[in-house]
Curated annotation (Swiss-Prot):
The lineage of its organism: Bacteria, Bacillati, Bacillota, Clostridia, Eubacteriales. Residues 72-85 have a biased composition (Basic and acidic residues). PROSITE patterns: G_ENGB. This is Probable GTP-binding protein EngB. SUPFAM superfamilies: P-loop containing nucleoside triphosphate hydrolases. GTP binds at residues 29-36, 56-60, 107-110, 174-177, 207-209. Gene3D superfamilies: P-loop containing nucleotide triphosphate hydrolases (3.40.50.300). The gene is engB.
Length: 233
């Protein structure tokens, strides 16, 4: 079986987060940087996370449950209905999820979007910071940047914040297919320098949702930080 993934819920308050205790990996990045496309590429489902050319589309924490070895159906359990992915797991289904290495990808609101009010930006910042600092199920953070452009001030601030709070993280530079391969080293060097990735051993993965470049590297990092399991990527 291949990877199975399902949208579970959108949360605008901590009380709405899933309570089944499965590990979580958060995705942070500026608006329209390609977080949704990255999620879809990881699970090989272009329709899972809604993509848009309009920045600021994601205005909540979107939780996607990922079954890396395919979704099992415990013996005696009825076939789930189309809305089963939206409910909290319990009983045999939760046990099967834990045994199979299921986890959540959490798509967070993009930072740096100018077309919202200052009050809305503060509310998003409060929600994101509260999640990243207090969520016990969080295993790591994928910071997404655009390979085509130097990091923004918000990218640098987020990197420093992640480093300050010692959160396990991986920086992923998306849209590698949008520039020529010969330009990759130069663009990679700029991003690494601006984000301070050169001297402390923090990796930077080049990624393309179109070609699959970097997909295995991101999965490898997720495996190392969620738990040990093997699966058909």
């Amino acid at each position: 079986m291949g990877v199975h993934a399902e949208f579970v819920l959108s949360a605008v308050a901590q009380g709405q987060f899933p309570q089944d205790g499965l590990p979580e990996v958060a995705l942070v990045g500026r608006s329209n940087v390609g977080k949704s496309s990255l999620i879809n590429a990881l699970v090989r489902n272009r329709k899972l996370a809604r993509t848009s050319n309009t920045p600021g589309r994601t205005q909540a924490l979107n939780f996607y449950r990922v079954w890396p070895q395919g979704k099992p159906r415990p013996e005696g359990e009825p076939q789930p209905d189309k809305d089963a992915g939206r409910t909290a797991l319990s009983g045999p289904v939760l046990q099967a999820a834990r045994e199979s290495g299921a986890f959540y990808l959490v798509d967070m609101p993009g930072y740096g979007f100018a077309r919202v009010s200052e009050a809305q930006r503060r509310e998003w910042a409060r929600l994101i910071e509260g999640y990243l600092l207090t969520r016990g199920a969080l295993r790591g953070v994928l910071q997404i940047v655009d390979l085509r452009h130097p990091p923004t001030r918000d990218d640098v601030t987020m990197r420093e914040w992640i480093r300050h709070h010692r959160l396990p993280s991986l920086c992923v530079a998306t849209k590698a297919d949008k520039i020529g391969r010969t330009a990759w080293p130069r663009h990679r060097q700029v991003i690494a320098r601006e984000l301070g990735l050169d001297g402390d051993g923090e990796p930077l993965v080049l990624f393309s949702a179109e070609t699959g470049l970097g997909r295995d590297d991101v999965w490898r990092w997720i495996r190392e930080h969620v738990q040990d399991w093997t699966f058909d990527m």
